[in-house]
């Protein structure tokens, strides 16, 4: 045994418990056993696939419930089970342990008796095994005297020695620790594992709905020479191979539209985007979006797609209602449409139109305690006033539409000539969940808008888009009329994947923050 294998490493936060566990690891190695074996092997060195705890329970729990097996019964069925030790009780000649394995956190009791495993093996169990260790056990399926399905162990082996103690749920796992060390959260909290499964179910459902409509999933570049597709501040990096400054994508829009120009007429992508902006309970620097584009569709078709996606996800999770501090969200009712200018006018008691001067809007902002930038023009002021005054009041699903043109430089002018654009934001529970446009495909107007954006960028606006000549070149080849949709996947999960009331199945009573929905969110380094 090499000194390197047996030496205790220098760990900055070494505790007495960790030191004891390292000594147990050393004893395992000194005795010729492995603390971290490659797997469970037979005498000839062949791999033995462990039996899943869930499968053992699925076979025998119904027999217990039906009375075919009762307390004290034994079977001749020998199983090989692997799991993490989450409970242990050692007595004289009989030891008990709960083993946990699988995404569902399935558990089964292991019983080690002097008669079955022998004196030395039982002594080793008592002296070498701690909470948090992974172990292999081989033995017969039995029912304990207390009526609990168990494995009467005849042989055990270490699968992975835990050096750090398992956390105590309420003592060691505050909210900050749960987010920073998600592996601990997953280890001890079933709710954390359940949220991971719900997230996976939601993304599968989104894909299914789109693919049922003939969409094809694409993968587009994360590193970009020109940032665009949204108004947001990008992360900047440098490609050494080309000695070229680049940015991380803030949206997937422009490459997906290029694909539609090329003839892939229904496309989507679910992927991470990166925005170098604020961090709070609803915003993360990196987050997951869905974007999809459909030739010969418009904002109304995309509204149908959005509603179908969200309702399908709710149905998969069994969600029928979502309770908030402001009331109950009903996804099954009518999804309303609210035009920006009339909606804001009603909220402030003053008629606001595209002709309302910026000075009047600043006076309204001051009256309603809305902070504004003196450099903002009238369109920007309308957008901010609506977002601060009206948006938080929209509880049930509402498509907010007829925005001023500067809100979305990639949306087409409204067909009714109202000096607005064909774009909507979906607001649910006072929060934007997604957006869609009738896409701007006129390359002349698009060049004008992106040129205006590039001038803002050159003047120091970090959120303005840059002029993407290749995207404009694609539009100049002729893009079909199309609708486009963007959905914040994390915010959809926040809406639907919260804890449900056990007394009222289907009613979500607590919505998680964005840091809970992202498995490993970006966190400020610990001091």
Spans of model-derived segments:
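Class II aminoacyl-tRNA synthetase catalytic cores and aaRS-like
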Residues: 1-527
